[in-house]
Design a protein with these regions (language model features):
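N-terminal cap/lid segment of alpha/beta-hydrolase-fold proteins
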Residues: 2-48
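Mobile cap/lid helix-loop segments that gate and shape the active-site cleft of serine hydrolases
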Residues: 16-18, 24, 192-225
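Short, surface-exposed "cap/lid" segments of acyl-processing enzymes
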Residues: 45-51, 55-78
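Catalytic nucleophile-loop/oxyanion-hole region of alpha/beta-hydrolase
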Residues: 66-76, 87-142, 279
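Primarily recognizes the serine-hydrolase "nucleophile elbow" in alpha/beta-hydrolase
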Residues: 126-197
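Short beta-strand/loop motif that positions the catalytic acidic residue
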Residues: 235-237, 241
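C-terminal catalytic histidine-bearing segment of alpha/beta-hydrolase fold enzymes
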Residues: 236, 250-296
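Conserved alpha/beta-hydrolase "acid-adjacent" motif
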Residues: 242-251
Length: 296
C-alpha cells in the first residue's frame, strides 16, 4: 500500500492536472452512430506551416464511463499550441447493462465494454485518414504519432499492434499502420501484470468481460502479447506513480525485449501519474518532446 506521503502527492498532482478547464475542439467528427463514437480535432496553433504532424490522443480513466475525453482536452490543446494537428478519440466505456465486478463491495463504475471498446478504437483508426484529409488538410498523415495516458496508453499501444493480432480477429489489419510511432504515457501496457497488481480496482479484468474470459481474451487485447510490432515505441513513466506502478511499464519493456524489440522507457523521478498530461507540469513537456522526436 502507498504511504501517506505518496497518496498526498498523487492527490495534489491530480488536483493540478484537473484544474484546467476543458478546451473546446475546433471540429468534431463522428465515426459511428453512438454518442461516444466521435473524434475531436484541434488545429495547430502558432506560425502557419504547409504541413504538420498528426497526434492521435486516447484518454485514460480506467475505461470507465464517467471519464471521457474532456479531461484530456487541455493536453490536446497543449499539443496544438506546439504546432501539432490533434485528433482526440472518444470510445465506449463502462456498460449500460450489468457486468461482473472485481469485488462485490467496490463502488467504482464498471470498466470497459467487450468488444465495443476495441471496436471503436479500430473504427476510429480506420476512418481517420479520410476524415483528417477532409477536416484537417494541413495534417501530414505520414507523420502520425499515437499517444495515450493510462488506459488510453493501453489503447494507443493496441491500436499500433493490430497487424499482429491473432489471425481471424475482426480487428486485425494485414499491414502495419502508417505511423511514426507511439508514445504511451503511464500505460496499462501489460494487462496480465496490471491485473496481478490490482491496478485501478479490478478494471483490467472488467475490460475483458470478467475473470472467466480474461486469459482467453488477453491474446487479442494485451499489448505485451502483441509483439514485436516493428513500430517505434516509447513509454514515459513517473517513478512515483501509485495509480499505474512502474512495474507495469517494466514488464512491457521486458516482453518487448524477449520478442526482439527495443522499447524506449523514459522514467521520470519524483513524478506520479497525472503530471504527464498536466500542461502546467514539467513532465508534460517531456512527454510532448518525446512525441516531437518521433513526429518531426
Amino acid at each position: 500500500m502507498p504511504d501517506a506521503a505518496a497518496v498526498a502527492r498523487d492527490a495534489a498532482e491530480a488536483e493540478s492536472a484537473f484544474a484546467h478547464p476543458p478546451v473546446e475542439p475546433d471540429l468534431t467528427w463522428a465515426y459511428g452512430d453512438h454518442p461516444d463514437q466521435i473524434v475531436d480535432f484541434y488545429a495547430p496553433r502558432g506560425p502557419e506551416r504547409e504541413s504538420v504532424p498528426l497526434v492521435v490522443v486516447f484518454h485514460g480513466g480506467a475505461w470507465r464511463a464517467p471519464y471521457d475525453r474532456r479531461h484530456i482536452s487541455p493536453f490536446a490543446d497543449f499539443l496544438a499550441r506546439r504546432g501539432f494537428a490533434v485528433a482526440s478519440v472518444e470510445y465506449r466505456r463502462g456498460r449500460d447493462i450489468p457486468q461482473p465486478r472485481a469485488r462485490a463491495d467496490t463502488a467504482a463504475p464498471v470498466a470497459g465494454r467487450w468488444p465495443e471498446t476495441f471496436d471503436d478504437v479500430a473504427a476510429a483508426m480506420d476512418g481517420l485518414p479520410v476524415a483528417v484529409a477532409r477536416l484537417l488538410p494541413g495534417a501530414d498523415l505520414r507523420r502520425t504519432v499515437l499517444t495515450g495516458h493510462s488506459a488510453g496508453g493501453h489503447l494507443a499501444l493496441w491500436a499500433a499492434a493490430r497487424h499482429v493480432l491473432p489471425r481471424g480477429s475482426a480487428w486485425r489489419t494485414e499491414t502495419p499502420a502508417n505511423l511514426r510511432g507511439v508514445v504511451a504515457l503511464a500505460p496499462l501496457a501489460d494487462l496480465a501484470r496490471a491485473a496481478e497488481l490490482g491496478v485501478c480496482g479490478g478494471a483490467v479484468r472488467q475490460l475483458l468481460g470478467g475473470e472467466a474470459e480474461f486469459a482467453a481474451r488477453c491474446a487479442s487485447a494485451d499489448p505485451a502479447l502483441l509483439l514485436p510490432t516493428g513500430i517505434a515505441t516509447v513509454v514515459v513513466q513517473g517513478q512515483e506513480d501509485i495509480v499505474v506502478p512502474p512495474a507495469v511499464a517494466d514488464s512491457y519493456a521486458e516482453a518487448a525485449a524477449k520478442a526482439g524489440e527495443s522499447v524506449g522507457l523514459t522514467l521520470l523521478p519524483e513524478v506520479g501519474h497525472f503530471p504527464l498530461i498536466d500542461p502546467a507540469a514539467d513532465a508534460c513537456a517531456v512527454a510532448v518532446e518525446e512525441i516531437a522526436q518521433l513526429a518531426w
